[in-house]
A protein has these predicted regions:
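S-adenosylmethionine
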Residues: 1-120
Length: 120
């Protein structure tokens, strides 16, 4: 990845060489692909895409071993899962620990990638 020189200079001063090197390594890695299963539609065998690893903080979340072409996946179009970054799933985990009564959540998305969450 070719980062702008002024960005690199500023960020190295801010973070130090070791942490900046870690940042650069992370930016070169292939980003993980995670999905959130729809618990109302994904209970049967074969409903979950194969070769997945659970997301530790979300019962419905899984990491995929590789990024499929979601456009052609009938499971996505049938509503069995939604492509969602695992960090976006963390809020539900926190709320379960802090709030000891039912919580109504509204998860909104807007193209080309904005997300909003409302909890009540």
């Amino acid at each position: 990845m070719n980062l702008p020189i002024p960005f690199c200079t500023y960020t190295k001063q801010l973070m130090g060489d070791a942490l900046f090197a870690t940042l650069c390594e992370g930016l070169e890695d292939t980003p993980p692909v995670s999905i959130r299963m729809n618990p109302f539609k994904s209970k049967g065998a074969g409903a979950c895409p194969t070769d997945t690893t659970p997301v530790a903080w979300c019962q419905e979340g899984v990491y995929m071993a590789s990024r499929p072409n979601f456009t052609f996946d009938p499971l996505l179009h049938a509503g069995l899962y939604y492509v969602q970054e695992a960090s976006s799933m963390f809020l539900a985990h926190v709320l379960r620990r802090l709030v000891h009564r039912p919580v109504v959540m509204l998860d909104l998305c807007a193209a080309p990638g904005g997300k909003s969450t409302l909890a009540r």
